[in-house]
Amino acid sequence: MAKEYFWGATLSKDKKIFKWDPESDFLDDEDDDEEDSISHFLFLKQAVLGVNAKDDDRNVIEVETINFDGETVIQPLLSLRLGLNESTNLDIGLQPPVTFKLALGSGPVYLSGQHALDLQEDEEFGKDFEGAEAYEVGDEDLEDEDEGEEDEEEEETPKKGSPKRIVKKIAAVKGRMKGKGDELDEDEDDDEEEEEEEEEIQTAKGKKRPAPSAKGPAKKLAKVDKDGTSKRKVPNGSVENGHAIDDDEDDEEDEDYKVGDEEEEEEATSGEEEEEDEEEEEEEDDEEMALGDDDDEDDDEEDDEDEEGMDDEDEEEEEDSSPVKPAKKAKGKVNGTAKPKGTPKSQANKGMKEKKTYSLEDMKQDLIKSPSKPKKEEKFKNFVKSKFHLSEGKKIQELWGWYKSTQLTAK
């Protein structure tokens, strides 16, 4: 715990030396024990020249104290002069004893700071005092316990001589043990029943037959001896020769096998349906890609794609004719005849394209008037091919150079 107080001192021509030692100034010999628990510190903060100081009078303050090695140190601390520097800030910590001296000048010089007191040792003294009290309380508790034990021994001595009380105690203990034993037996029975139910559920789930093939469900396995009697394994490990050992167990096994077979059949059928759906989606994607390419390519490329489309349809017919998968109708067929890849709309457009031919100047005029102007070379080439049915790379490159030089790409 620390406390701080204001401190001030004045040095002048009448009093040039001031000694600060609170440990020796304010305490008597009787208070030595109290002083050991207090530490004093002095923190200098400011020095100010008084109003009565003389002009051109230099004032120098020296400090005398003891350093860490126990040696006396004398050091100039500050210098003040009227009209030049009349005050100065300080940040110096000192421990007693300290002596301040006006070594030069007539002053007056006013020193100010903080006097701090550290009371940490008082807390330790309080802890020691609390420990002493706790020790005394502990001794009292021990004495009370000893007295209580002596009283109990005195009470037990007459009880030992009375057999009736002993018999009653034994009977009461036996009754308690019996009640606890019955409760334990009931708990064990409940635990066993729960374990049996869990085992039955696990066996019902785990009794799955081997994975069947796609052709059909697995069949029951049975061994036949030479005499014609069938043998099959029973869950308890025994073998039955033509007769059922336990009808209830056989019925449960048959039900489990049926459930397992039905689940396996459902899994097999669902797997086939998923495969069929995936194949149909792939075929639809292929057809959409083929139709998109027909609109962008020229006449020769459209003919090639028509031939490829016919090849794809032939492959689909071969896949549909396989015995494993059910027959499906190929898309694009009506009444057994395949539709051509090109739609009537595309065929009409094709006829219109063949009728009209474009010259280089016509193409340039159309490009200038066209509202949609591609900015990249690849898009420009595709645009020219689809609009003017131009397949000559030289003319396309010439158009691109003109198109780029006219700065139509920036519009």
UniProtKB/Swiss-Prot annotation:
This is Mitotic apparatus protein p62. Pfam families: Nucleoplasmin. InterPro entries: Nucleoplasmin, Nucleoplasmin_core_dom, Nucleoplasmin_core_dom_sf. Keywords: Cell cycle, Cell division, Mitosis, Nucleus, Phosphoprotein. Residues 351-367 have a biased composition (Basic and acidic residues). Signal peptide: none annotated. One of its GO terms (molecular function) is RNA binding. Residues 134-378 are annotated as: Disordered. It is found in: Nucleus. Belongs to the nucleoplasmin family. Required for mitotic progression. Binds to chromatin. Residues 134-156, 183-201, 246-321 have a biased composition (Acidic residues). One of its GO terms (cellular component) is nucleoplasm. Its main location: nucleus. It comes from the Eukaryota. The lineage of its organism: Eukaryota, Metazoa, Echinodermata, Eleutherozoa, Echinozoa. GO terms for biological process: cell division; chromatin remodeling. Phosphorylated by CaM-kinase II in vitro.
